Structures are given as structure tokens and as C-alpha cells.
Amino acid sequence: MSAYSTSIAINADQETIWKVLSDVAHWHEWTPTVSSVEVLNTPELKLNNRYKVVQPKLQPAEWTVTFLTPSSNFTWESKSPGMHMVAEHILNPKGENQTELTLTFAFHGWLGKLIGRVYGKTTEAYIQTEAQSLKKRVENQ
């Protein structure tokens, strides 16, 4: 398994951040790491919803929401032969108007180990960019 994580403090309440984070279909509007998101069932974030995500330098991937605590966190997973990817998005309140965002990404499976090594730097850069982009989007609303 190859795993990556980043955290950032955002000067906004959890609910304000969640409104942007949970609007997956519009991520391409605020982060350069997402080119497009195709909603495969309903646009609102809920368990078992599926999204096709296109990212620069990467193959398109279909993601399924597998864990959800509204206004707090969600996990989605993408599976292909030999590889299983898991991404977590976690919000933790740190004060009256500050929230910590933590993003994690893990590659599992025999192919996931190899892909994780090859794309490790890209993955790390992408989750850091996503965290910084979300912070900028929310704080500049």
C-alpha cells in the first residue's frame, strides 16, 4: 500500500467548507487537479453515489461514495483490476471560525503498489493543491 496525506487550516466554519467540498460535480471550478466530473446518478453527495472524475495526467476513474458523515467527512473508492484507490476528505472544527481539512489517498492491491510508486509525487502534489485550492475558494467567497 502507498498512502499520502495532507492537512490545512481553513478560516471558515465546517458547514461553509462542506457546501463547497460536497459539491463534487463542480470541483473543476476551483481546483486545477480536476478537469471534469460526470455525475453517474444523482449530483448530491450520498452513499453509493458514483462519479467519473477526469484529472490532468491521469486516466479517468469512476469513484463510489462508501462512507459519509454529512458536514464532516466522506470517503470514496475506485476499483480496477489489481488496484483499489481510497480517498478520504475530513473536516475537524478547530475553533469558532476555523476548520482543519485532512485529505488522504491510498493505493491498494498488487498494481496499486506499483502505481503508487510511479504516481506518488503527482498524488502528493494533487492532494496538497486540492487542499490549498479549497482553502482559497472558501476564504475568498
What are these regions (language model features)?
Residues M1-T42:
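Hydrophobic ligand-binding cavity/cleft-lining segments
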Residues V54-E100, A106-L111, K136, N140:
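Hydrophobic-ligand binding "helix-grip"
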Residues A106-Q141:
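A conserved amphipathic terminal alpha-helix motif
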